[in-house]
Amino acid sequence: ERPLVLDADALNLAAEGLFDLRALAKSRPILSTPHAGEMSRLLGESKSNIIDDRLAALREAVRRFEHCFLLKGTPSLILNAGRGILVGSQGTSDLAVGGMGDSLTGVCGALLAQGLGVMEAGALSLYLTGRAANLAARGASLTPTDVIQWIPDVLVERGAGISELGLPFVSYDADAAR
């Protein structure tokens, strides 16, 4: 089966029990991309508990639903069963506006359609959208359109091509969060 990326209303419907997220994950690769509010509904925990220990929430979601999760926030975290945790290193708090999650999900879907694995698609999507936000340099007025318009520039950027982690899209030289 083809991979799925789930966000927003799909996650809310799963939280309401309208479909079995765990059973669906047995039939195909899934990447779920909740923010803290969506994760709180999925896990039946308060949003403050999710925010207080994002890593524990991420681990619990992966354990309970048996697929890859990208927990959006500062920093964004990605985890899949049996894999290490990936930490998003690009972007700023300016990405926390309406529509940015849709941009991230769209990039994830495009990368999944090209054959990337769910964890790799999530990590590369975080990098592409975060770096594009940094290049747009719009500050608090940043819009999803700004981010999408800068992705082609990110794709042609050239760096050293070396990563101590063996992942060419992970870097730790990001600007400090605002």
Task: Give residue spans per PLM region.
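Glycine-rich phosphate/dinucleotide-binding loop and adjoining beta-alpha-beta core of small-molecule
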Residues: 1-90, 156-178
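Hydrophobic, well-ordered secondary-structure elements that form the walls
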Residues: 7, 102, 121
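Flexible, active-site-adjacent loop/turn segments at secondary-structure boundaries
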Residues: 9-12, 37, 93-95, 140, ...
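Solvent-exposed, flexible loop/coil residues
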Residues: 15-17, 46, 99, 146, ...
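A short glycine-/small-residue-rich loop at the edge of a beta-strand within enzyme catalytic domains
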Residues: 30, 48-52, 95-98, 138, ...
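Gly/Ser/Thr-rich active-site loops/lids in small-molecule metabolic enzymes
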Residues: 51-64, 87-112, 118
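Short, surface-exposed, charge-dense and proline/glycine-enriched linear segments
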Residues: 99-109, 148-157, 166-174
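Conserved post-catalytic alpha-helical subdomain immediately downstream of the catalytic base
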Residues: 106-152
